[in-house]
């Protein structure tokens, strides 16, 4: 398939495909009994999947030491290409000692199913504190990304991977659209400019506002909710997806929006993850990417607009995707509509600030989000799911 469908090259110039061919799959299955096995957790399995389908292009496997250290320190791969998040496979000392560099390793799902193969090219120890400070800007274990890091094994395994088979998503098969397919669909829709939107929350009025602002200047919106591993207090993916469907059916023009699931796991790395999310959407064929307040943030670890400022650390041609930076949107009681400080003269109590966190807090208290926060149909769906 043409890798430059809709004219937008993947990051690094080539859309990676590491899904085993039928012949390769048969060969791997025949070798399976003799291969050492590693059981992946949910995050590692989603990383394997994203590498295989090209979502993490140009990566064709888990990072080696040179790429890892370059990304941690400089937000670039060893060849100089921008990349802001380490993508690694961490194991215990015992597991690392049991396999040799140069060998083939079977990768199994958390349920024990044979999922893929790693050609082990390197094993290396890494400094968790160094990664935590550079990637997450903190070593505090209460940060969910740091906790995952410190819970992981001390040795990283590197090498190219193959995904044995692309299975339909168990919950959202109709929205499982891989990068090669999204590019083809954008071309069929004759969209030349596409803005990607990353979300792990139900769409509230502030999200709707910035999405529609972006839609005024591009051909299409690619709504790309994350359905991989998130924090335990995030709204479950099936609930969020029903809310997205309601929004698209009632409040967006059908021919201007496309939704697909993002199987990736959240890192909660704030500014660095904003770059990462933008590059992933570039691989899916987007030309633009929405960056709002505290993108991919958690708690108070990052400044409100740090995730926007970080784009200034790269030349636009290096990223080759345009960040659309939006201020914190609010409901303005004076103008009775959504606005930002750029468009509203209101002050203080005239501004009702919205966030996914506030919606989650209201639901946990048994309160229904008001119309200023959420469309009534979405609020009703959330209330039903939370059994208010």
From Swiss-Prot:
A single GO BP: sulfate assimilation
SUPFAM superfamilies per the UniProt record, alphabetical: Nucleotidylyl transferase, PUA domain-like
Pfam families: ATP-sulfurylase, PUA_2
Pathway info: Sulfur metabolism; hydrogen sulfide biosynthesis; sulfite from sulfate: step 1/3
Annotated source species: Trichodesmium erythraeum (strain IMS101)
Family of the protein in this entry: Belongs to the sulfate adenylyltransferase family.
Protein name stated in the entry: Sulfate adenylyltransferase
GO MF entry, a single one: ATP binding
This protein's UniProt keywords: ATP-binding, Nucleotide-binding, Nucleotidyltransferase, Transferase
């Amino acid at each position: 398939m043409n890798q430059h469908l809709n004219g937008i090259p993947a990051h690094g110039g080539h859309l990676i495909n590491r899904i085993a061919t039928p012949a390769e799959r048969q060969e791997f299955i025949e070798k399976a009994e003799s291969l050492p096995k590693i059981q992946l957790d949910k995050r590692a399995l989603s990383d394997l999947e994203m590498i295989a389908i090209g979502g993490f292009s140009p990566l064709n496997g888990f990072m080696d030491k040179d790429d890892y250290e370059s990304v941690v320190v400089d937000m670039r791969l060893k060849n100089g290409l921008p990349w802001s998040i380490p993508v690694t496979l961490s194991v215990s000392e015992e597991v690392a000692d049991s396999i040799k560099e140069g060998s083939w390793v079977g990768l199994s799902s958390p349920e024990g199913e044979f999922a893929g193969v790693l050609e082990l090219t390197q094993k290396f120890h890494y400094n968790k504190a160094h990664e935590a400070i550079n990637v997450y800007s903190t070593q505090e274990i209460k940060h969910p990304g740091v906790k995952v890091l410190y819970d992981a094994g001390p040795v990283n395994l590197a090498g190219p991977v193959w995904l044995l088979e692309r299975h339909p998503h168990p919950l959202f098969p109709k929205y499982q659209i891989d990068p090669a397919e999204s590019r083809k669909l954008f071309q069929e829709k004759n969209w030349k400019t596409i803005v990607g939107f990353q979300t792990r929350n139900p769409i509230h009025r502030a999200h709707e506002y910035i999405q529609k602002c972006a839609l005024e200047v591009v051909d299409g919106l690619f709504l790309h909710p994350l359905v991989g591993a998130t924090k335990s207090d995030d709204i479950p993916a099936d609930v969020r997806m029903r809310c997205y469907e309601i929004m698209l059916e009632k409040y967006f023009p059908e021919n201007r929006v496309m939704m697909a699931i993002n199987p990736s796991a959240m890192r909660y790395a704030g500014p660095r993850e904003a770059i990462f999310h933008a590059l992933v959407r570039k691989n899916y064929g987007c030309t633009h990417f929405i960056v709002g307040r505290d993108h991919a943030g958690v708690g108070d670890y990052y400044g409100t607009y740090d995730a926007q400022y970080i784009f200034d650390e790269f030349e636009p041609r290096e990223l080759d995707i345009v960040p659309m930076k939006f201020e914190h949107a609010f409901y303005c009681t004076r103008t009775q509509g959504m606005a930002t400080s750029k468009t509203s003269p209101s002050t203080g109590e005239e501004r009702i600030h919205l966030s996914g966190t506030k919606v989650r807090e209201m639901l946990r208290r048994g309160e229904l989000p008001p119309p200023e926060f959420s469309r009534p149909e979405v609020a009703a769906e959330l209330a039903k799911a939370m059994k208010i």
